Amino acid sequence: MNKFIDNWKSSGKIKNIAIGASAILIIIIGICAYFYYSHYTEQEELKLAKERKEKQIKNAQNAITDFYTKAFEGANITQLIKVLSEINISRIPLQETGFYEDYYSCNPNECDFKYVLKDNAIFNSQNKLFFEKSYEPIFSDKELSYTNVGSLMNQNSLSELFNQDKDINLVSCSDLLNYIYSYNSSKKQVNDKIIITSLPENSVASQESSYPEYRHSYGFMVGQFTVNHSDNPFVMETFWLGKPFQKSFLITGLTKMQNTKNMVTLEGKFICKK
């Protein structure tokens, strides 16, 4: 009997020890789990913070790149003269077959043309050749229209340097504006002036100031202008001849209005250093 009681007491002590050990083990596991979870959570927060920062940087830099990709679209003065020359050459076959050019409009990617049959002329549908490509017309009984004609008006040295991630040096906005204002004040005829329609601005200035070392952080500003002048390429070339800062001017629109005698409205931008 005494032996049974002794065994029961020993068994109770063992159980108490086992319970105590289990409790200690649970506490240790809990502490380890807590520190592991805390460390894991901290690492996840650091990872998420890093990802957010990287995304923020990427978005800012993409915004800068997108701004200048758009800013550098257009034709430089040399390319403008080439396009006007092609417009004048390409209208000759249509004029010789009884049509007159009523309207055209070009942007950096494409042009639209409209020709109207002259009085007493015989209608004849025909393709239009433009920069060695042939375009079929949409026609009615007295009109020929050509749409989506490749304009080649998106060529300039600024976009080439930009696409090669090279340095670009431009005149300051104060010097360029001073020149335009001075030039305009010396001209009496509106067709001899460069009309500023929007002063220079930069929609990504804050991003550029945050990431000045980014390869596309040029610190440029973009203004808008128009010019009303003859679409004769020689006359247009004379208009721009000798003007300084020509690299800063890009042409984005070219429109011959209806009922005008070979007069064209240039729409463009001027880019300068702030």
Question: Which functions belong to the PLM regions below?
Answer:
Residues 1-10, 37, 44, 173-176:
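Short helical patches
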Residues 3-4, 10, 14, 42, ...:
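Generic detector of bulky aromatic hydrophobic side chains
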